[in-house]
């Protein structure tokens, strides 16, 4: 009597395993995130993603570092911000029919240069003025590209609780 019961249980386990395997293959292929076994596509982020990943956090950190008069960190963040703009201009050379390198140049070149001087001289007032100019340049670019609703401001608080912006003592 045990033989037929065990045989039936083994058969049920085999059928259940096969069903799970088929369903998991079907689910992976139908996943909204794509097939995990597929070859990766080239990374092609959109303008908004690049701004959120590369530009906005660096703009914020630059402002926080300058506000704390942490000039080495401010200099580093300025370099990172310049590199971020270069990546954006290369990754998306034209956006909405407009030349991105020219937009970036017109919006931020002068304030970035003034920020560089202020940081090297460790001159807080000039830093604040240049940073305000950078922020206005960002917003002017947004207005030019019909995104005036994206308003950047001088940060009033840190969104990076795991980073100290005051200079080390």
What do the PLM-derived regions correspond to, one by one?
Residues 1-13:
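Bacterial N-terminal signal peptides that target proteins for export
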Residues 20-23, 29:
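Boundary at the C-terminal end of the N-terminal hydrophobic targeting segment
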Residues 24-25, 146:
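C-terminal ends of transmembrane alpha-helices
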Residues 30-169:
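Sequence context surrounding c-type heme c attachment/ligation sites in exported
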